[in-house]
Structures are given as C-alpha cells and as structure tokens.
Curated annotation (Swiss-Prot):
Disulfide bonds: none annotated. This is GMP reductase 1. Homotetramer. It comes from Rattus norvegicus. InterPro entries: Aldolase_TIM (IPR013785), GMP_reductase (IPR050139), GMPR (IPR005993), IMP_DH/GMP_Rdtase_CS (IPR015875), IMP_DH_GMPRt (IPR001093). Keywords: Metal-binding, NADP, Oxidoreductase, Phosphoprotein, Potassium, Purine metabolism. Catalyzes the irreversible NADPH-dependent deamination of GMP to IMP. It functions in the conversion of nucleobase, nucleoside and nucleotide derivatives of G to A nucleotides, and in maintaining the intracellular balance of A and G nucleotides. GMP binds at G242, G243, G268, M269, S270, R286, A287, S288, E289, G290. NADP(+) binds at residues 26-27, 78, 129-131, 180-181, 269, 285-286, 314-317.
Length: 345
C-alpha cells in the first residue's frame, strides 16, 4: 500500500552551519587528517578523507598521483586494464595506499578485480559500486567479496537509508557509499522518481553505520567547498566528489576548443556516452540515467584541492573544531531560504 513519509528531508542547499565560539587563532591550526580502523577488515588508514569518484573521467591514475601528495584518496575507475595497473604500481608505489580498485557486481568484474589485487597486493581498498545497492544480489556479492578478501577494506553502495547501511556492514562492507541521484551528471531522480535529499541521508546513515562501528561516504550533491564541510558536519567519514574534480588536466580526455573556450568532457557512468564507450550502447530494456556535459577547462587540479582544503579549515575555525574529526560534534545546522548574496551571481 502506498504511503507518504511526511518528515521533511533536507539537502545541503537548505541549510547553513551556525558559527560558534572558537579558541583557534588561525586556519593553519586545523588538522584535517583522520585515522580510521575499519570494522571488518581490521585495517587502519590515515589521510584526509576526501575521495575522487570512481568515474572514468575523474578517477584516473593521474588524479591519484596528485591526490596522494595531499594524503587524499582516489577510487580508480574500473575500466583500466591489468597492465595499466601494473604500470601504475611500478611507477607510483607511493600512491597505492591511497587508492581503491573499483568493481561492479558481475562475475567478469570479480575476476578482473581479483587479478588486479593479486598483481598489486599493496592496494588494500576495494570499491564495489552499483547504482542500486538495495538488491539481494548485491548483498550476496558483498558477502562473496568479503570471503575472498578478508583483509581488504570494502567500500560498497549506493544506498540512502539506515537499514540498508546496516545490512551491507553486517554482510562484510566497511564503508558504505551514501547517495542516490544527487550527482551533478546523474539523472536518476528525473528518470525514475527515486532518491533522497543528501543531508538527511548522510545524517541518518551515519547514525546507523556508527552504531555498528562502520563508516560512510557521502557521495554526490556537493557543488562547492561549503557543501563538503556540510557533509562532514552531518556525520560523513569520507566525502566523494566527481563534478568538483572534473575539467582538470589530470582528468581523462583531450581538451576541446570551441569558440575560443577550452573545455573537457564529463559524463555520468549511466549516461549514453559511458554505455556506448564501455557496453556498446544503451540496452533496450533500460534508460540512460546520466548526462554528458562540457566543463570549462580548469587547469591543474592542485588549485582545486587547495580551495577545498582551505574551505574545510575555515569551516572548522568558524565552528570551533580544532580537528576535522570534531566537526560533526560542533555542527549545528540552521534552515535557510537563501545561501548567499546573488547580486553578482
């Protein structure tokens, strides 16, 4: 029987963080590094918990090289070959602790991932990525991967509700990806009518995960460094970004010149572009749930990284958090009708 949940759910655009008294004298005093010990793998990881999404335009080896210099993380897209991985591992061994191998839930995906992890044993993270993390098949796949790789840290998703976060953690996942439809090039919500506002999803899923000593990634909906800060404030352990890292030198694809403007292609992994590239086209039984856009070329990603990290440090000083770990404890969200002054855009 159809039912309506009348509780209002909120997104990042619906709130601001209230400033609070602080003893910090400078943004430079803020520690953005986190150390986690994961529930099922028992592995420990230290770094700044911002992740480049495993999309084939941004989740590249070139991106991982720069991100690892800042102790940040990259979920490498699943379309690199075994030889590509071997070459990367040989030339950039210092990056391997800050990357994940990505996989879908098919048998071919599992076989390819297994070969990569056997060839590059220094990689300890697995990112199991499907559009709909609610299927029984996916839960069974997570259990299978856990049985085959008992000491690897498994990221799995995507879901947006607490009961499914708990199910995946109890099935062997360590970190749950939270977000259905909020991405900048995702059209799931308009094609299917399915989704969940990201701020509320993160708050609710973090509560469920942390009760089981699990962790979550807020995946999608961030448009600016302030949104990244709100995701951490809402309880996310990691924040995954795609659109904010698009358009850079380190992204896949050539720079396009059109009408004197430099551009780079960025597309969702369920878009026509991605499915034609990797699956020979859109299957007749499904619809494209992503868009393809031309993003203004932004140059090297280093400047964007510094902008995001600088914004996070500033957020922490405004709310009195000396460490990123403290941000969620110091966060009070206020509902708003406007985010900023729009006189000049």
């Amino acid at each position: 029987m159809p039912r309506i949940d009348a509780d209002l759910k909120l997104d990042f655009k619906d709130v601001l963080l209230r400033p609070k008294r602080s003893s910090l004298k400078s943004r430079s005093e803020v520690d953005l590094e986190r150390t986690f010990t994961f529930r099922n793998s028992k592995q420990t990881y230290s770094g700044i918990p911002v992740i480049v999404a495993n999309m084939d335009t941004v989740g590249t080896f070139e991106m991982a090289v720069v991100m690892s210099q800042h102790a940040m993380f990259t979920a490498i897209h699943k379309h690199y070959s075994l030889d590509d991985w071997k070459h990367f591992a040989e030339n950039h061994p210092e990056c391997l602790q800050h990357v994940a191998v990505s996989s879908g839930s098919g048998q071919n995906d599992l076989e390819k991932m297994s070969l990569i992890l056997e060839a590059v044993p220094q990689v300890k993270f697995i990112c199991l990525d499907v559009a709909n993390g609610y299927s029984e098949h996916f839960v069974e796949f997570v259990k299978l991967v856990r049985s085959k790789f008992p000491e690897h840290t498994i990221m799995a998703g995507n879901v947006v509700t607490g009961e499914m976060v708990e199910e995946l953690i109890l099935s062997g996942a360590d970190i749950i990806k939270v977000g259905v439809g909020p991405g900048s090039v995702c059209t799931t919500r308009t094609k299917t009518g399915v989704g969940y506002p990201q701020l509320s999803a993160v708050i609710e899923c973090a509560d469920s995960a942390h009760g089981l000593k699990g962790h979550i990634i807020s995946d999608g909906s961030c448009t600016c460094p302030g949104d990244v800060a709100k995701a951490f404030g809402a309880g996310a352990d990691f924040v995954m970004l795609g659109g904010m890292f698009s358009g850079h030198t380190e992204c896949a694809g050539e720079v396009i010149e059109r009408n004197g403007q430099k551009l780079k292609l960025f597309y969702g992994m369920s878009s026509d572009t991605a499915m034609k590239k990797h699956a020979g086209g859109v299957a007749e039984y499904r619809a494209s749930e992503g868009k393809t856009v031309e993003v203004p070329y932004k140059g090297d990603v280093e400047n964007t990284i510094l902008d995001i990290l600088g914004g996070l440090r500033s957020t922490c000083t405004y709310v009195g958090a000396a460490k990123l770990k403290e941000l969620s404890r110091r966060a009070t969200f206020i509902r708003v009708t406007q985010q900023h002054n729009t006189v000049f855009g």
